[in-house]
Amino acid sequence: SKSKLSVEQYKKLSIGSLYALQQGGYLNTLSLDIKDKLPTILGEWWGINNAHDARETLDDLCRKGYDYYFPFVYEAFLLDDENAQDDIFQQNMESQEDYEKAVGQLQNLKEVYEELIAYEVITSKEDIARYGVIGWDAGRINFVARACCDMKYISEMEAWNYIDKAYELAHSSFTSWHDMAMSYVIGRAIWGGTNAHNLGMKG
């Protein structure tokens, strides 16, 4: 709804700006106003087709985002020996699914590292640790909550609850919009590797 929002609510919506912008969505209303794209975005990309799927996915995103894997992915990234990298994942991942996700994220980070340097997102490996991936996690929670609300899978009140969680996540992790944006780009790179068109922000 295009109701008047408070300054605080605008601030909270802005956590999802980068993700919303990529999909052509509105930045300053709870509604993204991209209804024609949402069945594809939610159904095909996220596997969300109803209220149950919506809540399950959003709860999972809040509970276990990329930040869950990041300390181990980064630790492995600093090592050259593949067996040592594998040991980190074997010791710390609780399931085969988590193990495979961590391995995939490490591959993507290796793939995009030079690109992130070239585009001056980062200047060193240390910057990856400094920014982390919480910006990506928060952006995804925010966007998916708004998309699910637009599809009437969850209520506006529920959407704001998730948006609040995303805001708290970002607010407690970053002191500037710049750092959050860099974290978003790094998280997106770890998600998609070189196929993510990281710097053109497509997809």
Model-derived regions, located:
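Polar/charged low-complexity regulatory segments
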Residues: 1-156, 160, 165-203
